[in-house]
């Protein structure tokens, strides 16, 4: 944790931050709100996904986020017949779990984009949760990432007691987007191996109290030994 001009900040992602490397900056309160809402949706057995937004003049833009827009997970179109077939073509994992993957409802997406534009803010990145997988940027994440955005935030809730926030820089050709029911994929949930994807540090900033709440949420203490972080017990998958 460091203090910069009176503002307290800390790296809260697995990826460390070193001078000369890109990082994403977010207020600790925004990170905490994001985690809490994602956890509520996860407990309901659903997947979270949405948009991260910021004012165009914000420091570090577009590698920053000052607000979050959640889409209604009950409107996930992933299991509509056409989309379902395309996801099934990505491998066994996507045939086994019908909550693996998401497709935003077009009407909801349009309404959100209009509201964001009217507010004077801009979309800087998408985000979504991994309900069973670690905080990697998977093969299917790469294929479905909108190349208009330079980064993407993954929230792993594989162990809900120890959530993980990990942003990734993503470089894609504008025409490289989408999946098809003609694919014959396998292992699409595994990490994308190419140089087009790079993990970024996530630097949270704010009051000491907000930082403490966030770091405690991400790294809870073991009740048997308050000095030692709890050991995660990942779910299968």
Question: What does each of the following model-derived ranges do?
Answer:
Residues 1-123, 131-237:
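Conserved beta-strand-loop surface patch within small alpha/beta domains used
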């Amino acid at each position: 944790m460091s203090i910069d001009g009176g503002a307290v900040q800390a790296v809260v992602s697995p990826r460390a931050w070193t001078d000369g490397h890109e990082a994403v900056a977010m207020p600790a309160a925004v990170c905490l709100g994001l985690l809490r809402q994602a956890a509520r949706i996860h407990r309901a057995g659903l997947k979270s996904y949405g948009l991260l937004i910021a004012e165009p003049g914000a420091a570090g833009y577009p590698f920053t986020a000052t607000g979050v827009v959640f889409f209604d997970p009950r409107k996930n179109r992933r299991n509509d017949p056409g989309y379902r077939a395309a996801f099934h073509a990505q491998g066994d994992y996507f045939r086994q779990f019908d909550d693996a993957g998401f497709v935003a409802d077009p009407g909801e997406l349009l309404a959100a984009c209009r509201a964001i534009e009217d507010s004077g803010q801009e979309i800087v990145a998408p985000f979504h949760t991994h309900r069973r997988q670690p905080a990697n940027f998977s093969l299917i994440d790469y294929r479905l990432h909108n190349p208009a955005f330079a980064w993407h935030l993954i929230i792993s809730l594989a162990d809900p007691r120890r959530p993980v926030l990990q942003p990734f820089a993503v470089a894609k050709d504008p025409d490289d987007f989408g999946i098809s029911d003609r694919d014959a994929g396998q292992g699409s949930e595994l990490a994308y191996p190419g140089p087009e994807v790079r993990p970024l540090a996530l630097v949270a900033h704010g009051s000491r109290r907000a930082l403490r709440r966030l770091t405690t949420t991400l790294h809870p203490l073991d009740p048997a030994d308050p000095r030692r972080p709890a050991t995660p017990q990942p779910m299968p998958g």
